[in-house]
Amino acid sequence: FPVPSIRKLYATKPLSYVANLLGHEGPGSLFTALKAKGWAENLSAGSGMVRDAEGTFEISIGLTPTGLDHIESIGEMVFDAIRQVRVHGIEAWRYAEQKQLAKMQFRFQEAVEPITLARALAARWHEYPLEDLLYAGYRYDELVKAQVIGYLSRMTPENLHLLLVAPGQETDQVDRWYGVRYRLTQLPEAWVAAWRAPSHVTALSLPVMNPFVPNDFSLRESLDTTLHPVRIVIEPGFDLWFDHDLEFGLPHSSLYFSIRSSQARGNAHQSVLTELYIALVNDTLSELTYPAFLAGVG
């Protein structure tokens, strides 16, 4: 969608607010609904091109072969998701949650090499005031509903540029620079009409409050001064080791589980089955673990 430039609104981030809701991958999300139908493998939403006067907002969906046959229905689901955000999703608590996550990311970000930081700051100097070079990308001052509504009003079928990249498509032009074959065409009027007044998709709902977002970052005092991991549980077939950080002082913990079985890697066939099982488990749990991922857990 062509939209006005977001560059001068970095302190309130209305487009990032919309992107976080449309690109959510938890229960009730657009991606979860598309995935349940077998139509999509991935989805992302956010700013695309950003210039001084104009920009784009992009929703990118990785389609399955089946999804390629249901573009009209997928578009209807996309515009119903946009409608839900416009009607029910502009709420102060949602903005406060995004603000808290951004503060966490800024406060507890890992150190980078000085040369890397210098290059990043030099690039930002063209976009942000000097005093905001470090914090601009994480700054969320307040929810300005008019700004959010203004950007959502640009997300209409009439303002949509739909790009389809897939094998076997008919083309009638060749790009002069790269030799890529393509075709330009108007969207079918039936699609535009359906997307203009999308049917309500019962599988879609806005994200609930994220239970993994912390507010207390205080560290527990510990008398443990051991410099090496200590085995604190010893049972048949099970050992538990603990290592207390004495250097960084961050509210982070890391859990590592190693489950070993002779049947998991006994031969090539078992190894392949194990990898497939791991992929299936991760895919099945992704809807439940996504809120934790947003909060930096994982």
Q: Where in this protein do the model-derived segments appear?
A:
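Mature, solvent-exposed C-terminal subdomains and processed small-chain segments of exported/organellar
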Residues: 1-298
